[in-house]
Amino acid sequence: MIALIQRVTRASVTVEDEVTGEIGPGLLVLLGVEKDDDEQKANRLCERVLGYRIFSDADGKMNLNVQQAGGSVLVVSQFTLAADTDRGMRPGFSKGAAPDRAEALYDYFVERCRQQEMNTQTGRFAADMQVSLVNDGPVTFWLQV
């Protein structure tokens, strides 16, 4: 399971001219689900995403996680993160989970975030989405479990 996380001052996702999720300061989480992923990996990745200390403390040091910084989380499914880009000029998607399994694990990940009392907004699974963000820093990390 893969999370591309970006520290943002604001982010939103729109589907068919409807805003489905919007946050102020916090994390935009682009989530990719691979074939061998399961609930255990989703739990671990959620723990890492919410615990990752990439927000500045009073001394300007990256020492706070999103909850400590008072931020929110916007989770957007992105199957292209599971692409095989090792060769050729076209990505392959054989590493990605089947859509029904990927959606179940995406929903599970979102619910785990909410269970941590995290303000968690979402996109719409498998939809054509427009994602807007202001990357703060820029600060972007690839987390994989």
Curated annotation (Swiss-Prot):
One of its GO terms (cellular component) is cytoplasm. It is found in: Cytoplasm. A motif (Gly-cisPro motif, important for rejection of L-amino acids) lies at residues 137-138. Pfam families: Tyr_Deacylase. The keyword Ribonucleoprotein does not apply. InterPro entries: Daa-tRNA_deacyls_DTD, DTD-like_sf. An aminoacyl-tRNA editing enzyme that deacylates mischarged D-aminoacyl-tRNAs. Also deacylates mischarged glycyl-tRNA(Ala), protecting cells against glycine mischarging by AlaRS. Acts via tRNA-based rather than protein-based catalysis; rejects L-amino acids rather than detecting D-amino acids in the active site. By recycling D-aminoacyl-tRNA to D-amino acids and free tRNA molecules, this enzyme counteracts the toxicity associated with the formation of D-aminoacyl-tRNA entities in vivo and helps enforce protein L-homochirality. This is D-aminoacyl-tRNA deacylase. It comes from Enterobacter sp. (strain 638).
